[in-house]
Regions:
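Sec-dependent bacterial lipoprotein signal peptides
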Residues: 1-4
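Periplasmic c-type cytochrome electron-transfer domains
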Residues: 6-191
Length: 191
């Protein structure tokens, strides 16, 4: 009789077990709108949302560590930018205003950017990092910074299991957080 065990020295299994984090959908939406769009390969998890939120507010995604997603998608302005043209890294001025990021879970046609050129929230998050005006860096540089950071390796491990940090996992975490940005009680919503 031969038996193998999949536990480590302290008796815990090394199995990846993320904590599901269903969206907190307002009753108004439950009553009047079809369910949100959540990709099967990127389910909402507590760990993924936590990682995505940290990434969203951290300027580590930009070339000179000065520009975060929240720099243009400001929580003080309902995750929008009140400026006519958004300002990127090194003070470079873009040609458009950044899009608002609330209620993204209900973007049924899955088209992003003002011209609709990208077809998922996960893929949308890829472009600002490499845009020369917005964050002006490469994904290889970002992944290296994340791998060498004191917090991110553990956060990625908790969110996605024992796999290497990649640009795809980074954008999945960002998308999970962005799907939690739900508005339903503003003056506009109540009208």
């Amino acid at each position: 009789f031969f038996c193998l065990s999949c536990t480590n020295d302290n008796g815990n299994t090394d199995q990846y077990m993320p904590t599901p984090s269903p969206l907190q959908i307002p009753q108004l939406f439950e009553d009047t709108i079809i369910p949100p769009v959540i990709p099967l390969d990127n389910p909402q998890t507590v760990e993924g949302v936590t990682l995505g939120k940290k990434l969203f507010f951290d300027p580590i995604l930009s070339a000179n560590n000065t520009q975060a997603c929240a720099s243009c998608h400001s929580p003080r302005n309902a995750f929008t930018d009140p400026a006519r043209f958004s300002v990127g890294v090194d003070g470079s001025v873009g040609t458009r205003n950044s899009m608002p990021l609330f209620n993204m879970a209900w973007n049924y046609d899955e088209r992003f950017f003002w011209d609709g050129r990208v077809f998922s929230l996960e893929h949308q998050a890829l472009e600002p990092v490499t845009n020369p005006i917005e964050m002006n860096t490469t994904w290889d540089a970002v992944v290296t910074k994340l791998q060498n950071h004191e917090d991110y390796p553990q956060l990625f491990l908790e969110a996605f299991g024992d796999v290497p940090i990649t640009k795809e996992l980074t954008t999945k975490a960002l998308a999970q957080f962005e799907r939690t940005l739900i508005t339903s009680n503003s003056k506009f919503d109540r009208h």
